[in-house]
């Protein structure tokens, strides 16, 4: 039996596009054949994510996204990606404040960057990994950009 549970939370920031963001997350889950999920996405400020980054990764600095996988035995077999229904259980924590900086750095709109890091976090929850940030060679990052292209929303 499939369970679909998606929660969006906002901590210490203003975010007025929860409905559009919710629809985007659902479209990404569908694109990845994820029909069984328990997922919370927390949009927050740098202080909130820095505290979590320090506590769980011993890095006392903000970051764009943290993925907390509660289904740790997820091991992705990339040869079997097509046609498989994945189950994910976890939390994504995304610093909207940090995204303002990274969107400027990459010369993209902040909501595009939000969508990109959301996909990135979901892929990590599925078990995807990457060694570099090479968007031309890393399979995970290529998939991320393809999903973004197909599911991008206007906020």
Swiss-Prot record:
GO terms for biological process: rRNA processing. It is found in: Cytoplasm. Keywords: Cytoplasm, Endonuclease, Hydrolase, Metal-binding, Nuclease, Ribosome biogenesis, rRNA processing, Zinc. The keyword Metal-binding applies. PROSITE patterns: UPF0054. Its EC number is 3.1.-.-. The keyword Cytoplasm applies. Zn(2+) binds at residues 120, 124, 130. Binds 1 zinc ion. One of its GO terms (molecular function) is RNA endonuclease activity. Its main location: cytoplasm. One of its GO terms (cellular component) is cytoplasm. Its cofactor is Zn(2+). Belongs to the endoribonuclease YbeY family. Single strand-specific metallo-endoribonuclease involved in late-stage 70S ribosome quality control and in maturation of the 3' terminus of the 16S rRNA. This is Endoribonuclease YbeY. It comes from Borreliella burgdorferi (strain ATCC 35210 / DSM 4680 / CIP 102532 / B31). The lineage of its organism: Bacteria, Pseudomonadati, Spirochaetota, Spirochaetia, Spirochaetales. The gene is ybeY.
């Amino acid at each position: 039996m499939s369970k679909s549970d998606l929660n969006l939370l906002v901590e210490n920031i203003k975010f007025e596009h929860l409905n559009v963001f919710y629809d985007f997350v659902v479209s990404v889950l569908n694109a990845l054949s994820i029909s069984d999920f328990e997922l919370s996405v927390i949009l927050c400020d740098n202080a909130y994510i820095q505290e979590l980054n320090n506590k769980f990764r011993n890095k006392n600095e903000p970051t764009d996204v943290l993925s907390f996988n509660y289904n740790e035995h997820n091991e992705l077999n990339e040869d079997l990606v097509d046609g498989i229904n994945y189950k994910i259980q976890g939390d994504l924590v995304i610093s909207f404040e940090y995204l303002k900086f990274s969107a400027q750095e990459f010369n993209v709109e902040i909501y595009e960057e939000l969508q990109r890091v959301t996909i990135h976090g979901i892929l990590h929850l599925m078990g995807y990994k990457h060694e570099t940030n090479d968007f031309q060679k890393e399979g995970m990052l290529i998939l991320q950009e393809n999903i973004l292209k197909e599911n991008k929303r206007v906020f």
